[in-house]
Regions:
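C-terminal catalytic/acceptor-binding lobe
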Residues: 4-7, 174-275
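Short beta-strand-to-loop acidic/aromatic patch adjacent to the donor-nucleotide binding site
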Residues: 70-86
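N-proximal low-complexity "stem/linker" segments adjacent to membrane-targeting elements
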Residues: 1-55, 269-275
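Alpha-helix termini
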Residues: 32-39, 65-74, 176-179
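Short, conserved alpha-helix that lines the donor NDP-sugar binding/gating region
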Residues: 53-71, 221
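Short, Asp-centered acidic motifs that coordinate Mg2+ and/or phosphate
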Residues: 77, 101-102, 230
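Conserved catalytic core of nucleotide-sugar-dependent glycosyltransferases
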Residues: 88-203
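Anion (oxyanion) recognition and catalysis
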Residues: 36, 96, 223-224
């Protein structure tokens, strides 16, 4: 738990095109209530119209660090919450008050495991929706998963719901001064002149596995290389919003439906559904 200082969180949200999901909006409204209840402060910072997600994240970090340079007592945590994540404010409180350097939520992938559906339906239709979803989880010790208050250590975690202590960035600046860069961004019509631009969130090829790592997994590796740990909250429910295409062909439906047969004028049998 955090002691001797009231936590203060900058919620950082990349929102390309200025778009936010309904669940995100409800979550932001909810977190103000949860923060007041749990005695910490929140400030919302968004970045629209930056198509490069890596640069958006690094810029939001630089703004967090700029604010800290101006007033070291202003923020204790930066929390990335992506605009397509639906959440409850208490999930944010669990991250902030956990005491972990990096604490993350786990949300479903934007996919449905269609191949498993027949098997799942045969077993039981209870919780079918949840069983058909997939999650990106890479436990640090899969043979002995230790859970404390719903949190466990992992190798990788997504940035879409990630709470990071300020001290993490200060340690990384000291360890990775070579990652500092000069920004060429134009923000609000002006050249962005922050002195705190570091490529902490950038895609890499992992040295050991040769895997291509996204910017969130790459950040995890940088932090782990200097002795840091990543924890995830297994208890807090999250929603991952996406655009699902309901693609259909009514002719195909007739052909595969076994309920009622009809004959078309060309002589081919069709199947007609009763509903």
């Amino acid at each position: 738990m955090i002691k001797n200082k009231t936590p203060s969180v900058m919620i950082a949200t990349p929102c390309y095109g200025g778009q936010l999901s309904e669940g995100y909006l409800h979550g932001v409204m909810s977190v103000t209530q949860s923060a007041a209840k749990n005695n910490y402060r929140v400030h919302l910072n968004t970045m629209g119209n930056e198509s490069l997600i890596t640069r958006a994240r690094n810029t939001l970090v630089s703004q967090f660090l700029d604010a800290d340079d101006a007033n070291p007592d202003l923020f204790t945590h930066l929390m990335f919450i992506d605009s397509d994540i639906g959440f409850n404010g208490d999930a944010v409180s669990r991250m902030v008050l956990s005491g972990y350097d990096v604490a993350c939520g786990v949300y479903p992938r934007k996919s449905i495991d269609w191949e498993r559906l027949p098997e799942l339906i045969k077993k039981s239709d209870k919780h079918l929706e949840q069983r058909a979803l997939g999650y990106n989880l890479n436990f640090s010790n899969p043979d002995n998963i230790e859970v404390e208050n719903g949190f466990t250590e992992v190798m990788d975690a997504a940035t879409g719901f990630m709470c990071i202590k300020k001290e993490v960035f200060r340690k990384m600046i000291e360890a990775y001064s070579n990652l500092k860069y000069t920004s060429d961004q134009i923000i609000n019509g002006k050249k962005y002149g922050s002195n705190n631009c570091y490529a902490f969130f950038d895609c890499i090829i992992d040295e050991k596995s040769n895997r291509y790592l996204s910017e969130d997994y790459a950040f995890c590796r940088l932090w782990q290389k200097i002795g840091g740990k990543i924890h995830v909250d297994l208890r807090s429910p999250l929603t991952h919003y996406g655009t699902y295409p309901f693609a259909g062909n009514v002719w195909t439906k007739f052909k595969i439906d076994d309920e009622v047969k009809v004959e078309n004028k060309n002589g081919n049998d069709l199947q007609q559904s009763k509903d």
